[in-house]
Curated annotation (Swiss-Prot):
Its main location: cytoplasm. Keywords: Cytoplasm, Flavoprotein, FMN, NAD, Oxidoreductase, Pyrimidine biosynthesis. This is Dihydroorotate dehydrogenase B (NAD(+)), catalytic subunit. Substrate binds at K45, N69, A70, I71, G72, L73, N127, N192, T193.
Length: 313
Protein backbone atom coordinates (compact mmCIF):
# COMPACT_ATOMS: atom_id res chain seq x y z
CA UNK A 1 0.00 0.00 0.00
CA UNK A 2 1.23 3.46 -0.89
CA UNK A 3 0.70 5.38 2.35
CA UNK A 4 1.11 8.73 0.61
CA UNK A 5 -1.28 8.23 -2.33
CA UNK A 6 -4.07 10.79 -2.62
CA UNK A 7 -7.13 10.83 -4.88
CA UNK A 8 -8.52 14.25 -5.82
CA UNK A 9 -10.86 15.32 -8.64
CA UNK A 10 -8.91 14.65 -11.84
CA UNK A 11 -5.75 13.78 -9.92
CA UNK A 12 -4.38 10.42 -8.82
CA UNK A 13 -1.34 11.48 -6.83
CA UNK A 14 1.42 9.07 -5.80
CA UNK A 15 2.08 11.51 -2.96
CA UNK A 16 0.49 14.82 -1.90
CA UNK A 17 3.55 17.01 -2.59
CA UNK A 18 3.78 19.38 -5.56
CA UNK A 19 5.64 22.59 -6.37
CA UNK A 20 3.42 25.65 -6.31
CA UNK A 21 2.77 27.65 -9.46
CA UNK A 22 5.19 30.51 -9.96
CA UNK A 23 7.97 28.92 -7.90
CA UNK A 24 8.95 26.15 -10.30
CA UNK A 25 8.60 27.62 -13.79
CA UNK A 26 7.82 24.72 -16.10
CA UNK A 27 10.24 22.43 -14.28
CA UNK A 28 13.20 22.70 -16.64
CA UNK A 29 15.63 24.14 -14.09
CA UNK A 30 14.68 21.63 -11.40
CA UNK A 31 14.89 18.64 -13.74
CA UNK A 32 18.66 19.14 -13.68
CA UNK A 33 18.61 18.23 -9.98
CA UNK A 34 16.16 15.32 -9.78
CA UNK A 35 13.61 13.24 -11.68
CA UNK A 36 10.37 15.22 -11.66
CA UNK A 37 8.44 11.95 -11.74
CA UNK A 38 8.90 11.66 -7.95
CA UNK A 39 6.48 14.56 -7.47
CA UNK A 40 2.80 14.12 -6.77
CA UNK A 41 1.95 16.74 -9.39
CA UNK A 42 3.39 19.91 -10.92
CA UNK A 43 1.60 23.24 -10.85
CA UNK A 44 3.07 25.04 -13.84
CA UNK A 45 3.61 28.78 -14.07
CA UNK A 46 0.54 30.90 -14.81
CA UNK A 47 -0.35 30.98 -18.50
CA UNK A 48 -2.07 33.87 -20.25
CA UNK A 49 -3.21 34.11 -23.87
CA UNK A 50 -0.37 36.38 -24.97
CA UNK A 51 3.20 36.45 -23.64
CA UNK A 52 3.73 38.70 -20.63
CA UNK A 53 7.04 40.25 -19.68
CA UNK A 54 5.98 41.04 -16.15
CA UNK A 55 6.64 44.07 -13.99
CA UNK A 56 9.78 46.24 -14.07
CA UNK A 57 12.68 45.36 -11.80
CA UNK A 58 13.46 45.16 -8.97
CA UNK A 59 10.59 42.78 -8.41
CA UNK A 60 11.86 40.50 -5.64
CA UNK A 61 12.86 41.50 -2.11
CA UNK A 62 13.84 39.34 0.84
CA UNK A 63 12.09 39.74 4.18
CA UNK A 64 13.06 38.32 7.60
CA UNK A 65 10.45 35.57 7.29
CA UNK A 66 10.18 35.06 3.56
CA UNK A 67 10.14 37.16 0.42
CA UNK A 68 8.13 39.71 -1.52
CA UNK A 69 7.61 39.27 -5.24
CA UNK A 70 6.00 41.42 -7.89
CA UNK A 71 6.81 39.33 -10.96
CA UNK A 72 3.53 40.18 -12.66
CA UNK A 73 2.64 36.82 -14.23
CA UNK A 74 5.58 36.75 -16.66
CA UNK A 75 5.06 33.81 -19.02
CA UNK A 76 5.65 32.82 -22.67
CA UNK A 77 1.96 32.80 -23.61
CA UNK A 78 -0.55 30.08 -24.42
CA UNK A 79 0.82 29.01 -27.80
CA UNK A 80 4.36 28.41 -26.55
CA UNK A 81 3.11 26.57 -23.46
CA UNK A 82 1.04 24.26 -25.67
CA UNK A 83 3.74 23.78 -28.30
CA UNK A 84 6.88 23.56 -26.13
CA UNK A 85 6.46 23.45 -22.36
CA UNK A 86 3.69 20.89 -21.95
CA UNK A 87 5.12 18.49 -24.58
CA UNK A 88 8.50 18.67 -22.80
CA UNK A 89 6.81 17.70 -19.52
CA UNK A 90 5.27 14.58 -21.09
CA UNK A 91 8.53 12.69 -20.47
CA UNK A 92 7.75 12.66 -16.75
CA UNK A 93 5.21 10.43 -15.03
CA UNK A 94 3.48 13.26 -13.22
CA UNK A 95 0.09 14.97 -13.66
CA UNK A 96 0.15 18.64 -14.59
CA UNK A 97 -2.06 21.29 -13.02
CA UNK A 98 -2.18 24.24 -15.41
CA UNK A 99 -2.45 27.62 -13.70
CA UNK A 100 -4.34 30.06 -15.91
CA UNK A 101 -4.76 33.83 -15.69
CA UNK A 102 -6.12 36.69 -17.73
CA UNK A 103 -7.08 40.34 -17.92
CA UNK A 104 -10.66 39.65 -18.97
CA UNK A 105 -13.25 36.94 -18.47
CA UNK A 106 -12.99 36.12 -22.15
CA UNK A 107 -9.24 35.54 -21.86
CA UNK A 108 -9.65 33.19 -18.91
CA UNK A 109 -12.27 31.19 -20.79
CA UNK A 110 -10.21 30.98 -23.99
CA UNK A 111 -7.06 29.86 -22.19
CA UNK A 112 -8.98 27.36 -20.05
CA UNK A 113 -10.66 25.74 -23.04
CA UNK A 114 -7.41 25.37 -24.98
CA UNK A 115 -4.98 24.30 -22.28
CA UNK A 116 -7.38 21.83 -20.64
CA UNK A 117 -7.24 19.72 -23.82
CA UNK A 118 -3.50 19.07 -23.51
CA UNK A 119 -2.95 15.34 -22.86
CA UNK A 120 -0.91 15.72 -19.67
CA UNK A 121 -3.03 18.47 -18.10
CA UNK A 122 -5.18 16.77 -15.47
CA UNK A 123 -6.62 19.87 -13.79
CA UNK A 124 -6.71 23.66 -14.00
CA UNK A 125 -5.82 26.13 -11.27
CA UNK A 126 -7.81 29.32 -11.79
CA UNK A 127 -5.58 32.21 -10.75
CA UNK A 128 -7.88 34.93 -9.42
CA UNK A 129 -5.63 35.96 -6.56
CA UNK A 130 -2.39 37.38 -7.98
CA UNK A 131 -1.87 40.78 -6.29
CA UNK A 132 0.83 41.99 -8.68
CA UNK A 133 -1.00 42.78 -11.92
CA UNK A 134 -2.98 45.88 -12.81
CA UNK A 135 -5.69 44.00 -14.71
CA UNK A 136 -7.13 40.59 -13.88
CA UNK A 137 -5.70 38.46 -11.11
CA UNK A 138 -6.90 39.66 -7.74
CA UNK A 139 -9.50 41.92 -9.38
CA UNK A 140 -11.53 38.75 -9.96
CA UNK A 141 -10.81 37.27 -6.55
CA UNK A 142 -12.00 39.78 -3.97
CA UNK A 143 -15.75 39.87 -4.67
CA UNK A 144 -17.56 36.54 -4.17
CA UNK A 145 -20.11 37.07 -6.94
CA UNK A 146 -17.41 37.98 -9.47
CA UNK A 147 -15.23 35.02 -8.49
CA UNK A 148 -18.22 32.70 -8.68
CA UNK A 149 -19.26 33.87 -12.14
CA UNK A 150 -15.75 33.46 -13.53
CA UNK A 151 -15.55 29.99 -12.00
CA UNK A 152 -18.87 29.04 -13.57
CA UNK A 153 -17.82 30.23 -17.03
CA UNK A 154 -14.48 28.42 -16.90
CA UNK A 155 -16.18 25.22 -15.71
CA UNK A 156 -18.46 25.35 -18.76
CA UNK A 157 -15.54 25.03 -21.18
CA UNK A 158 -12.87 23.16 -19.20
CA UNK A 159 -12.20 19.54 -20.16
CA UNK A 160 -10.69 18.79 -16.74
CA UNK A 161 -11.55 19.61 -13.10
CA UNK A 162 -11.11 23.22 -12.00
CA UNK A 163 -9.41 24.29 -8.77
CA UNK A 164 -9.64 27.93 -7.77
CA UNK A 165 -6.75 29.74 -6.08
CA UNK A 166 -8.33 31.71 -3.25
CA UNK A 167 -6.92 35.10 -2.25
CA UNK A 168 -6.15 35.74 1.43
CA UNK A 169 -6.53 39.47 0.76
CA UNK A 170 -10.26 39.45 1.49
CA UNK A 171 -12.47 40.29 4.44
CA UNK A 172 -14.17 36.90 4.66
CA UNK A 173 -12.35 34.00 3.02
CA UNK A 174 -15.05 31.52 4.07
CA UNK A 175 -17.72 33.44 2.17
CA UNK A 176 -15.43 33.58 -0.86
CA UNK A 177 -14.72 29.85 -0.73
CA UNK A 178 -18.39 28.94 -0.38
CA UNK A 179 -19.34 31.13 -3.35
CA UNK A 180 -16.67 29.45 -5.48
CA UNK A 181 -17.83 25.99 -4.40
CA UNK A 182 -21.44 26.81 -5.24
CA UNK A 183 -20.31 27.95 -8.70
CA UNK A 184 -19.05 24.44 -9.41
CA UNK A 185 -15.36 24.45 -8.51
CA UNK A 186 -13.91 20.98 -8.02
CA UNK A 187 -11.40 22.13 -5.42
CA UNK A 188 -9.59 25.07 -3.86
CA UNK A 189 -5.93 26.01 -3.60
CA UNK A 190 -4.96 28.33 -0.77
CA UNK A 191 -3.43 30.59 0.15
CA UNK A 192 -1.79 32.87 -2.37
CA UNK A 193 0.48 35.68 -1.20
CA UNK A 194 -0.45 38.53 1.12
CA UNK A 195 0.10 42.08 -0.12
CA UNK A 196 3.16 43.64 1.52
CA UNK A 197 5.86 46.26 1.10
CA UNK A 198 9.47 46.99 2.02
CA UNK A 199 11.09 50.43 1.98
CA UNK A 200 14.75 51.25 1.38
CA UNK A 201 15.83 53.31 4.39
CA UNK A 202 18.52 55.06 2.32
CA UNK A 203 16.15 56.36 -0.34
CA UNK A 204 12.85 56.33 1.50
CA UNK A 205 11.30 54.61 -1.51
CA UNK A 206 9.73 51.16 -1.85
CA UNK A 207 12.30 48.50 -2.75
CA UNK A 208 10.04 46.95 -5.38
CA UNK A 209 9.48 48.96 -8.55
CA UNK A 210 5.83 47.96 -8.34
CA UNK A 211 5.63 49.39 -4.82
CA UNK A 212 3.88 46.42 -3.29
CA UNK A 213 4.40 42.71 -3.74
CA UNK A 214 3.14 39.35 -2.56
CA UNK A 215 4.53 38.09 0.75
CA UNK A 216 5.29 34.37 0.86
CA UNK A 217 7.40 31.98 2.89
CA UNK A 218 7.37 30.92 6.56
CA UNK A 219 5.87 34.25 7.67
CA UNK A 220 2.50 33.41 6.10
CA UNK A 221 2.25 29.81 7.33
CA UNK A 222 0.17 30.52 10.48
CA UNK A 223 -2.25 32.60 8.39
CA UNK A 224 -2.55 29.88 5.77
CA UNK A 225 -3.22 27.21 8.39
CA UNK A 226 -5.87 29.32 10.10
CA UNK A 227 -7.65 30.04 6.80
CA UNK A 228 -7.58 26.40 5.70
CA UNK A 229 -8.84 25.37 9.15
CA UNK A 230 -11.85 27.68 8.74
CA UNK A 231 -12.59 27.03 5.07
CA UNK A 232 -12.27 23.24 5.25
CA UNK A 233 -15.10 23.15 7.79
CA UNK A 234 -17.35 25.22 5.54
CA UNK A 235 -16.92 23.47 2.16
CA UNK A 236 -17.06 19.89 0.94
CA UNK A 237 -14.54 20.18 -1.91
CA UNK A 238 -10.85 19.36 -1.33
CA UNK A 239 -8.18 21.94 -0.57
CA UNK A 240 -4.60 21.96 -1.80
CA UNK A 241 -2.83 23.93 0.91
CA UNK A 242 0.17 26.22 0.50
CA UNK A 243 1.96 28.94 2.38
CA UNK A 244 5.38 28.59 3.99
CA UNK A 245 5.78 24.81 3.77
CA UNK A 246 9.39 23.66 4.24
CA UNK A 247 9.28 20.29 6.04
CA UNK A 248 7.29 17.09 6.45
CA UNK A 249 6.05 18.43 9.79
CA UNK A 250 4.68 21.48 8.00
CA UNK A 251 2.80 19.19 5.64
CA UNK A 252 1.05 17.44 8.52
CA UNK A 253 0.04 20.78 10.03
CA UNK A 254 -1.72 21.65 6.78
CA UNK A 255 -3.38 18.23 6.64
CA UNK A 256 -4.53 18.52 10.25
CA UNK A 257 -6.05 21.91 9.37
CA UNK A 258 -8.02 20.34 6.53
CA UNK A 259 -5.85 20.21 3.39
CA UNK A 260 -5.87 17.07 1.23
CA UNK A 261 -2.58 17.84 -0.55
CA UNK A 262 0.00 20.61 -0.42
CA UNK A 263 2.07 22.80 -2.71
CA UNK A 264 5.57 23.99 -1.83
CA UNK A 265 6.49 27.45 -3.08
CA UNK A 266 9.18 29.77 -1.77
CA UNK A 267 11.20 26.94 -0.21
CA UNK A 268 12.14 25.79 -3.74
CA UNK A 269 14.26 28.93 -4.10
CA UNK A 270 16.15 28.10 -0.90
CA UNK A 271 16.60 24.38 -1.55
CA UNK A 272 15.85 22.91 -4.99
CA UNK A 273 15.57 19.46 -3.38
CA UNK A 274 12.91 20.48 -0.86
CA UNK A 275 10.04 18.59 -2.51
CA UNK A 276 11.79 15.19 -2.84
CA UNK A 277 13.21 15.63 0.65
CA UNK A 278 9.74 16.14 2.12
CA UNK A 279 8.42 13.13 0.19
CA UNK A 280 11.25 10.98 1.55
CA UNK A 281 10.72 12.21 5.13
CA UNK A 282 6.96 11.72 5.34
CA UNK A 283 6.80 7.91 5.88
CA UNK A 284 9.11 8.03 8.92
CA UNK A 285 7.09 10.89 10.38
CA UNK A 286 3.87 8.91 9.94
CA UNK A 287 5.55 5.97 11.67
CA UNK A 288 6.62 8.14 14.61
CA UNK A 289 3.05 9.36 15.03
CA UNK A 290 1.43 5.96 14.57
CA UNK A 291 -0.42 7.04 11.42
CA UNK A 292 -1.10 4.41 8.77
CA UNK A 293 -2.03 6.60 5.80
CA UNK A 294 -1.62 10.31 5.12
CA UNK A 295 -5.36 10.65 4.46
CA UNK A 296 -6.03 9.91 8.14
CA UNK A 297 -4.59 13.34 8.93
CA UNK A 298 -7.08 15.40 6.91
CA UNK A 299 -8.98 17.73 9.23
CA UNK A 300 -7.84 15.93 12.37
CA UNK A 301 -7.57 19.23 14.28
CA UNK A 302 -11.26 19.98 13.96
CA UNK A 303 -12.79 16.55 13.40
CA UNK A 304 -11.89 15.64 16.97
CA UNK A 305 -14.02 18.55 18.14
CA UNK A 306 -11.67 19.44 20.95
CA UNK A 307 -10.33 22.60 19.37
CA UNK A 308 -12.98 23.50 16.80
CA UNK A 309 -13.58 27.23 16.51
CA UNK A 310 -15.97 28.96 14.19
CA UNK A 311 -15.41 32.62 14.95
CA UNK A 312 -12.63 35.16 14.69
CA UNK A 313 -11.32 37.33 17.50
Amino acid sequence: MNRLAVELPGLSLKNPIMPASGCFGFGREYARFYDLSVLGAIMIKATTKEPRFGNPTPRVAETPGGMLNAIGLQNPGLDKVLEEELPWLEQFDVPIIANIAGSTVEEYVEVAEAISKAPNVHALELNISCPNVKKGGIAFGTVPDVAAELTRLVKEVAAVPVYVNVSPNVTDIVAMAKAIEQAGADGLTMINTLVGMRIDVKTGRPILANGTGGLSGPAVKPIAIRMIYEVSQAVSIPIIGMGGIQTAEDVLEFFYAGASAVAVGTANFVDPFVCPTIIADLPALLDDLGIGHISECIGRSWKTGAHAVHCRA
